[in-house]
A protein has these predicted regions:
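C-terminal ends and interior cores of transmembrane alpha-helices
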Residues: 38-52
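Cytoplasmic membrane-interface "Motif A"-like loop-to-helix N-cap segments
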Residues: 22-37
């Protein structure tokens, strides 16, 4: 039920991102996107390594939802459109979409391999054989990917929109 908080705040993050970039940053999306990326990494860290208290889990899902809402709006389309001429905006969105699905697929494969290679069979207290998954490596992989996701857009910080 706690994870259900995420999409509610994701909607708020999406709506808020447009207002924030247009009114506060005059259409410059790099600073709010960077901030949302850092917030997403912090929220993921809290969720994975924050101790598991009820408050920490709820806080991590609130922050994660807001951050993902902003990032999906910006990185999923708006920043790509900002970097290319208007005539190429459809192609830019298509490339971002394909790259997103390819990266998500690769993430699923790597996550599966990390979990498969860090799984042990154990006998529980009542004598049943159970499978135990060690999420240590996969958690660090997810956190590393989150950090990369806010560092990569910095490569285009000085780039201006191309005009046609």
């Amino acid at each position: 039920a706690i994870i259900g908080i995420n999409p509610i705040f994701g909607v708020l993050g999406t709506v808020f991102s447009g207002w924030l970039s247009d009114k506060v940053f005059k259409g410059d999306r790099k600073y709010p996107a960077f901030t949302a990326g850092v917030l997403e990494a912090i929220s993921l860290y809290l969720f994975l390594f924050g101790g598991g208290s009820h408050f920490t889990l709820i806080l991590s899902m609130v922050l994660f939802g807001i951050a993902i809402g902003v990032l999906i709006s910006f990185l999923g389309g708006l920043m790509a459109i900002d970097l290319v001429p208007r005539k190429a905006s459809g192609a830019a969105l298509g490339i971002v979409g394909v790259a997103s699905y390819a990266a998500a697929g690769l993430q699923n494969v790597v996550t599966g391999l990390l979990l498969d290679n860090n799984t042990v069979e154990a006998v529980n207290k009542i004598g049943e054989t159970v499978t135990k998954h060690d999420f240590t490596y996969v958690s660090w992989f997810w956190l590393g990917a989150a950090v990369i996701s806010f560092l990569l857009p910095m490569l285009n910080w000085r780039r201006r929109r191309q005009e046609i």
